[in-house]
């Protein structure tokens, strides 16, 4: 051996991990050295090298040696050896010199000979041989392509299973063809014909060598440009792609790029991934696996920006994006905002000359820009760059001041949040673009907003002085800056225009800026008339006599920074005030306008923080500092009075629950001492909490409730509040020191609102580990009021023992009678001691019932003082319990009265009115709340609702709301000053007193116990309670309400903050129960009182009787389109100011349309039919927009409308309409193309509406659709076209399931009960039954492609058993195409968890294997016994651990072990070669092949397919790292003892390990037994094959 052989070249040394033995590495290096010696040190080769390249057969000895060595290797070692040989060939070939070309060809030929000989002797598999032959070819074309070798490869292709073929085509396309030069001579192209033939054979669909979907994925993913140099291959690949066009279109909704939701839509749930993933740049790892299908460009996520655009451009639309800091939308904000600005500029150009620019949409755009930059969704430099480029192209200049105002807002307000320095040059360029050429400047000193925009450019340059941008100032800018400085020197606070400019241009840290904002704040708290410094609020509380708040026009002229400065000054006034001189109404109204014009985080958040802090301080009584206590309580009261009544509905409340949590914590703590101030604060905070939780949009209600109670007190022991909220019955008496914190009836109202929201939105919520079932079980529920409850809540109610929750009516009657009788027997003082100070639980809460009985018996007699003294000593919680006790007494008394009639209820109502309005012993809103919420049965609720009806109709109750109308009290938003003054007059006319004020006292000092009230009154407190009253009254009275009650209750809704939501929800939950005329009367009565409720004339005047249903639907759709598509000014039928509106313009038009349709006399079937006919009536400019609007309507309507659409869909089958449709018309998304030819088809329109309906609906409705409606559809499917028509609907639904982020987790949990699996199982069964009944199937190939796509993308192997059964019924050609669908090595039932091919499964397996690996290292001996314990009955048990063997036997055992290893090595050399590889068997034999004798290469192919099943990386390599000569798939395998390889060791190695502790005789017996077992398996397979054929 030469020196060179002893010391191999470092570049030739094999690099192996620890899994390979040193002997193996040594043998590999020896083979490489022998090959090198055979070629490079061959004397004959050197002599004949100039003459020929034919060496002759000089590899015979090497072949035999190589074969013997390979036969002793495991499969992994064989693969590693082949990889090293390939590296050897490529290493020589890459030395591109003239001498090395011949040598490289020789290396290739020798290695090929070795591989083919080893394959011939069955030492290596055909797959491994072909892979090696492919990779040794020199595709750099430095040497010739071996034609005979590639002919051999072509012949071997049919012998390889499809997983091996997939690897082969990957190697050819990705690893080899990429090496081709881009210019080839005709001769070299001709050499590559054999390679092209191999590829053509592999991708030929007719040969069916592997699933066509896999072929397509490999071709589209890995085809290099060099492949298109072969015309036949190029044509074949193009045809292959065209075959999958139907499947690609079928899995997408028709017109998907033009589908968009509406913010505040009941079915639009922002946190779901569906809408965010499409059009919002979501790069989910699960969206990659079938990108290889030839989708339309419109279906790419980046092309669906229209969805995001339509959400953003709607005012308040950004509030629906949740969570706000998600990066999914980040890259799209800048171009979309730029487009919106230029679009508004274009519309401004079209305005008449001299007309003022409407700022409705400009304010929205400014708010969007500020929101995007503050949340780091918009980069200033990129944004201004985009905007400058668009303006440069469009040349719009009229709205240049609005654009500069946006720039100024960014520069002025966000300098601490963003790096404005990077965008200075872009701002300068944008200014030059806007003010290029001659132009005229327009400003108005008497118009603050116009003045601020006129000087916005100059103010911007003043703030950018630090960045030296002022050096590029124009003369105009310099003159404007001079004007600003002169105005600062001659500061005039009365000049509102310049005041706004100065507040914007000078920061608070400058000398001028430090004077301006405090001067503005001082103006709000300085009375205009010094002689009248204060103004009397309700109950003679004094406030600063200033009502002139800053107008909206002035606030719109301030930047966000200036507004925040002013907000801080106002809040500082609220922190320091005198109880005899409260903050002015002007300060409150200015604060309200700032809060409504800014986002929650910029304004309301600071106010709520101050209110929460004030609440905390006010509950800490300081005995030594009474003045501080009173001031803290005053501050707490007027702040929550402002939040509850002036800002009852801020759209971002639903995202933040901190204030709600603070209120709950307040109620959790005991309120002490028992003072009238504490009573008033308690009642106010009850209202604040009720409004915060009850008046929410539907999705906000679900989110709010889930955030607060989405965990149980058992799961979250640290949350004390949840423990308190366990049982409502503990409100009066604590149990185990836990007491329900707030009024149980208020909390019950919020549960009703939560249940209605679940019904309307169709959402499903998690229940395990939450408080929701506990809360439902804690109450009694009248059955008529639970018709809309979800199934889980009804089941919880059934399990609840109603008798335990029912009050003891007999005890209540006797206790009340005794207390009433004792009033005549005891003196006043004795009576007070017994019923106020004695904590007897039976009599402690009966006083209101006693007073009620007293007034019933003697209505004309005044109440004596002892009653007031008893009430004075009750705590706020006691008053709540006493109110419920009163209702229980009334119910018991009515039930006990045998002569109960209508007059009885009138008497009760009249007495209650005396209590509430004349004697002030009880609050009317509290009494009404107890009446409608406290009853727990239908019988009790029926009694209480009749009393409530009569109570509302009493003169004393009616005169209060009529006083509002007679005095024309305006809404707070419309004229807040007149409203505050009216509230003062109202309380003068109808005062409400505390109990302490009604007790005559000798030492009365005249102290005013009333808290400061600016906005609250009885009318306001009644609004949320009347909402619930209407629901209960309709439910308990058969959804009828008297006209007198309807007219009375509707009067309150002039002041309701969410009247449209209320009307919509009432009609939704009562749909199908309230008769048409009653619904019309209900809507008309309420709509007449609501200022922003603009219904169509057709409904208001003619009740939808004048025109056809199609014309009605078209009018509603036109209104919706107008509210969504406006650019500058919204249509007249929506709110005029989006900042104070109940909802966005599009949502308002949608809700009003739904209200009309639900109250319409026409049936849902007739209206749905009209919606379909609309598409046939006239050509539509934007047909997909019409479809989308129809779907938005249907998803916002009750389920009966969807049922009508479902029946229309079934009618297509019944009428045989699919027979008139071509296959292409059904599956392809070409509806708009057919409309261009004026060929609308009703069947296609129905399918389109259904597709978009199920796209827009809530995800929770999809599983019921799969389980209930799909079977009904398939019952009517008779022909192949019917089935394709059904697939056109259900495949986009399966796709939507798949787009859900928790798709894999849900599939694993539900298995075959999961929607996509249910649908696909029904489809497969239907196709099988159709084939069995003789239905002709024309489009067989698309069906097969569809099933493969569904398997590898949507359903995996869960339906394998169904497929085996049903595919056997199909025609032979389809069975042949689908033979790979169920091809697996080991069949397993669906229950086997190992068959789940989900991403989460990989992580779980990895964690389990890592744990096993750790256990193996901790106790290797136990691990060895667990892994390799022999399972043969003749095998002896293994030896005990060494520590258990006696010392004198240990040496003997080691000698015996060494002898066994020698015998084992000798026996392994004598063992026969492995059996024929499984890929040579038919595929149905592969399915039944036993796992033990399977070759390792087949197991690894199968392992790769199983690990990449769905839904993610089915068709993809790992992206990181270089693919080492194309052999990474096999060669870079992990360590066999690594957790990933445990359980996958080669069978032969397992046999070796099992024989480790055997005697030589046992080893021979075991080897013979295994050989016989393999023979038996082969016979069994042949028998099964014969049976199958």
Swiss-Prot record:
Location in the cell: Nucleus
InterPro entries: Mediator_Med23 (IPR021629)
Taxonomic superkingdom: Eukaryota
Keywords of this entry: Activator, Nucleus, Transcription, Transcription regulation
Composition-biased stretches (Basic and acidic residues): 1392-1410
Single GO BP term: regulation of transcription by RNA polymerase II
Annotated stretches, region: Disordered: 1381-1499
Subunit structure: Component of the Mediator complex.
PANTHER family cross-referenced by the UniProt entry: MEDIATOR OF RNA POLYMERASE II TRANSCRIPTION SUBUNIT 23
Similarity comment: Belongs to the Mediator complex subunit 23 family.
Protein name per the record: Mediator of RNA polymerase II transcription subunit 23
Organism: Caenorhabditis briggsae
